[in-house]
């Protein structure tokens, strides 16, 4: 597979934030009399505000906004257990050394994404697309289209690296190449992605003299 740049999801792709995410949302579910399992089955890969609107249907915008602010604070400050996933730091350092452009494109808000990026010790991205920068979150294509644009690349010149079904669908809808890493086996359209991997350590990247990037 050939490309010119990378668009990485953050949670579940570059960082293992699953314990922190599930802890925050399970506690939120219990406070609202909901089954944690039902909430956790919905939230992954989606913007927090999307999930809150889903589970708080019928509530006022003010109530939803207040819950978002509270949840955002919890997720941005309770970072215990968050670590970089195997191969993430080495891959990003390799891209930087080779002069290959890359971005982080996350459904998380800026405070949450910055906190997790920092605690995991990841290199700084050239572009950081968070929930505040798009009107429609994943699985819509907006976030990955913006990421490609900010890197100065066409969507088809980018490869999206994702773990969540919503993110895989977003990357495909944007017209990007897609690598699914640890994606659930029942992810819709998984048969349409370029590579299905279990770890970032399986990715080999080589930059050609013409600027093309070969991924194996």
Question: Can you describe what each PLM-predicted range is?
Answer:
Residues 23-25, 74-76, 100-103, 131-133, ...:
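N-terminal start-of-chain detector that recognizes signal peptides
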Residues 13, 17, 106, 167:
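Ser/Thr-glycine-rich phosphate-binding loops at phosphate-binding pockets of nucleotides
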Residues 13-14, 79-80, 101-102, 132-133, ...:
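A generic structural signal for short
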Residues 14, 41, 84, 102-105, ...:
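Conserved SAM-binding loop
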Residues 1-98, 111-114, 122:
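N-terminal helical cap/lid subdomain that shapes the substrate entry/recognition surface
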Residues 1-4, 93-96, 109-216:
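Asp-based, Mg2+/Mn2+-dependent phosphohydrolase catalytic module
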């Amino acid at each position: 597979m050939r490309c010119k740049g990378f668009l990485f999801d953050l949670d579940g792709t570059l960082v293992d934030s699953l314990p922190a995410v599930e802890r925050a949302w399970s506690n939120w579910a219990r406070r609202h009399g909901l089954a944690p399992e039902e909430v956790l089955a919905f939230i992954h890969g989606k913007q927090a505000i999307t999930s809150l609107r889903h589970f708080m249907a019928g509530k006022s915008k003010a109530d939803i906004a207040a819950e978002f602010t509270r949840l955002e604070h919890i997720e941005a400050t309770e970072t215990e257990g968050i670590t970089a996933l195997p191969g993430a730091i080495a891959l990003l350092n390799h891209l930087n050394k080779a002069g290959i452009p890359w971005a982080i494109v996350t459904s998380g808000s800026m405070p949450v994404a910055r906190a997790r990026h920092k605690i995991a010790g990841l290199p700084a991205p050239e572009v950081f697309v968070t929930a505040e920068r798009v009107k429609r979150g994943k699985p819509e294509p907006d976030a990955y289209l913006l990421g490609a644009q900010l890197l100065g690349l066409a969507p088809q010149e980018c490869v999206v690296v994702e773990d969540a079904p919503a993110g895989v669908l977003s990357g495909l809808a944007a017209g990007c190449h897609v690598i699914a890493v640890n994606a659930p086996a029942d992810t819709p359209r998984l048969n349409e992605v370029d590579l299905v991997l279990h770890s970032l350590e399986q990715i080999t990247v080589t930059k050609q003299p013409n600027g093309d990037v070969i991924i194996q």
